[in-house]
Amino acid sequence: MLDICLLGTGGMMPLPYRRLTACMTRFNGHSLLIDCGEGTQVAIKERGWSVKPLDAICFTHFHADHVSGLPGLLLTLGNAERTEPLLIIGPRGVEKVVNSLRVIATELPFPIEFYELNEKEHVIQMDGYKIEAFHVKHNVPCYGYNVIIPRAGKFDPVKAKENEIPMKYWNRLQKGETVESEDGRVLTSNMILGEPRPGIKLTYCTDTRPVPAISEHAKNADLFICEGMYGEEGKEKKAREYKHMTFYEAAHLAKDADVKQMWLTHYSPSLVRAEEFMGKVKSIFPRAKAGKDGKTITLDFQEE
């Protein structure tokens, strides 16, 4: 199961009812944070979630509304006596940006490791899941992210016997381990399992124009969280000028990608009630919802 929470849905500046951009996931004792706007750690505490099992922080880009919550979060992790390394992923210059923000958090009891995004696509293998980063179109280097939990195929006893796999290795191979047998053979999970089954996929992108890379990478996502900076009529020119998206452009991306559902996020401060504009959005993509701070979902593997 993958737990997902929109911690903040605001763009540019926080409002009394809307914190700045951040999204958190939880899977099998591991947590991941995408962006860390002002108020992120307060939002985490409000949800009753914990920062302790945080594996990594993924930054889409380095505008202030996406990174301003980082120093306080790092200090909180330090005060919690964390010693495990923290991975921070982001576009070119990520180490320089983070170290600049750390001017008030210079001494931490844990090391920070950096993964710099400098290609159009990256795949980062984590413990039990993977992160895919893909380049999008903003006025600074910016990336969208997929969080993917793969699911192995079903155990196939006929295949196991055909490959002469001793029963004592079945359990370890089903867990994905590679085993050397007593006769020197290297045994792998594909020798006893069927074809991989559909896993769980979250796609997250914000601060971008609607480029083809988004719908390509969001294809068949279980949840597509996408920027909807403007819902009001007449904002199309502004969206093009500042490299953002309207609600309706996001809806077309969701339709093209055939995602299971879409949540809008990263609203302009001028947008007070996103729900008012959802009628037209749903006429394009019926499975769309207006995201709001604290909106949470648990995604599970599909029943077969």
Each language-model region and where it sits:
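Binuclear metal-ion centers of metallo-dependent hydrolases, dominated by the metallo-beta-lactamase
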Residues: E121, V211-E304
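Active-site-proximal loop/helix segment associated with metal-binding centers of metalloenzymes
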Residues: L15, Y129-Y204, T208-H217, L223-I225
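Active-site neighborhood of phospho(di)ester-bond hydrolases with catalytic His/Asp-centered motifs
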Residues: I34-G37, L54-F62, G90-P91, L202-T208, ...
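Conserved beta-strand hairpin/beta-sheet module of binuclear metal-dependent hydrolase folds
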Residues: M1-R47, P85, Y145-V147, G194-C205, ...
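Metal-dependent catalytic neighborhoods of phosphoester/phosphodiester hydrolases
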Residues: G69-T76, V98-L101, V272-K280
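General small-molecule cofactor/ligand-binding pocket signal
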Residues: C5, I89, E113-N118, E132-F134, ...
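A gly/proline- and charged-residue-enriched helix-loop-helix capping module
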Residues: K96-A105, F114-E119
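Active-site metal-binding motif and surrounding structural segment of the metallo-beta-lactamase
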Residues: G39-I89, E113-N118
